[in-house]
Amino acid sequence: MKKHLLAGACALAMGFAVIPGTFADETCNSPFTTALITGQEQYLHVWTLGMPGVGDESDKLVTISVDPKSDKYGKVINTLSVGGRGEAHHTGFTDDRRYLWAGRLDDNKIFIFDLIDPANPKLIKTITDFADRTGYVGPHTFYALPGRMLIQALSNTKTHDGQTGLAVYSNAGELVSLHPMPVTDGGDGYGYDIGINPAKNVLLTSSFTGWNNYMMDLGKMVKDPEAMKRFGNTMAIWDLKSMKAEKILNVPGAPLEIRWSLKPEHNWAYTATALTSKLWLIKQDDKGEWIAKETGTIGDPSKIPLPVDISITADAKGLWVNTFLDGTTRFYDISEPEHPKEVFSKKMGNQVNMVSQSYDGKRVYFTTSLIANWDKKGAENDQWLKAYDWDGKELVEKFTVDFNELKLGRAHHMKFSSKTNAAELGTNQSFPTRQ
């Protein structure tokens, strides 16, 4: 096993010799993703948590038509249940964009869907031994590398706290290498999101909390002083080719999503801290050293609005920021990255979590679920997908898909696809049957 992982790590490093430079599609895709949508997305895939007593109660991939020219616009056209409830959370495309990987934070299963026919996704492989083979728990972020899938976990099998690591898999679903989160030189060992700037040979990671916390009821957790101490307060700068952590950045308050500027001349990224409601800029200073700088507040931090997902515009002049507990989305002018200005806000509902925007910035989509035990209860448990047009000043609602009414479950992570680029997708992958 060690020889296999070492060989895989060497192959991984060699794979970065050619750096692609094209960005399109969703603005949070890995820069190594090809076959990008350059026009109107046609389908939206929503990785959805099953709910007890609702529909088939299973986690599922829900596909919605988002093409205004379609007679099924705004309608669910496909649901693919995967069986059971394991805390469905995030997804990510392989580099050739044919396969969508989707993870569950509780039972650690990973599902690989073939999207050669995006209106009818097919489940072609389930990885059931992620925790056993890696020692990690909670496969959270799925980030494409050349011929590989980089997975950021949230926890571990021994203590279920936030000590965790990164796992690299082949596109065929075979484990290649493991990379523990740094615990020296100020590292706290926590993980959450991944963001890569290939031009700088930089992998940036953020930090959240472990299984013991994220599977706890939110109301119970916030009243537990010890639990509230178990959140990450760092981000790590890694050498991408060697997969070695080089510097730890102090970013207190659980820095979550990472969004690099997509402009080639830029060398900065944004994140938001969940517990302190702050915006942070990660950049190089005049000496070329990577630093983290607090740049602003989100809402009223004293009320703990709980910032969650963020989305950067393709021109790097705007940033969407969702706050879960007050159900609000905000848009910031970040044309001066060190001086963000809130220029728009809208109350979306009782809760809001994920946000995805088209590359041209004209269409924005929102979903509501965060984590099953953290979502609001009863009548406040909004579960929907909403689609909007954005003109730079106002959000104009186009349609809503009510996941409660349709008995689908909790709407979480979104990914775009289109049948127009199916011919460009990678060839059919051979998936070994050995787990």
From Swiss-Prot:
Inhibited by EDTA but not by EGTA. Keywords: Copper, Oxidoreductase, Periplasm, Signal. It is found in: Periplasm. Its EC number is 1.8.3.4. One of its GO terms (cellular component) is periplasmic space. Pathway: Organosulfur degradation. GO terms for molecular function: methanethiol oxidase activity; selenium binding. Residues 1-24 form the signal peptide. It catalyses: methanethiol + O2 + H2O = hydrogen sulfide + formaldehyde + H2O2 + H(+). Its main location: periplasm. Its cofactor is Cu cation. InterPro entries: Se-bd, WD40/YVTN_repeat-like_dom_sf. It is an enzyme of class 1 (oxidoreductase). Homotetramer. Belongs to the selenium-binding protein family. Catalyzes the oxidation of methanethiol. Can also degrade ethanethiol, but not methanol, methylamine or dimethylsulfide. This is Methanethiol oxidase. It comes from Hyphomicrobium sp. The lineage of its organism: Bacteria, Pseudomonadati, Pseudomonadota, Alphaproteobacteria, Hyphomicrobiales.
